[in-house]
Amino acid sequence: MALFIDVHHTAAKGLDAQTMAEVHSRDLAIQDRYGVRFLRYWFDPVTGKTFCLSEAPSMEAVNAVHQQANGTMADEIFVVYEGQ
């Protein structure tokens, strides 16, 4: 399993924390189907940028969860490594 940061450029524009939590909970509800584990997310309601940290078998699996749960896909996905 690898760590991924995925970026949605405008998905959160104008959304509040409660709405983002609901969006995230839909990802969590189906993540096991794809072998994905979402760990954290950050968002900026002004710019709409959202960043999701996940552990997953592939970038495609991360996007499959987002697509199935919320009808959106990440604009960018990066493999990341945790520093010490």
Segments predicted by a language model, with ranges:
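Short S/T/G/P-rich N-terminal loop/turn motif that feeds into the first structured element of a domain
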Residues: 1-33, 37-39, 43-48, 65, ...
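Short beta-strand-to-loop capping motifs
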Residues: 8-10, 53-57
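An amphipathic, aromatic/His-enriched active-site/gating alpha helix that lines ligand/cofactor pockets
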Residues: 55-84
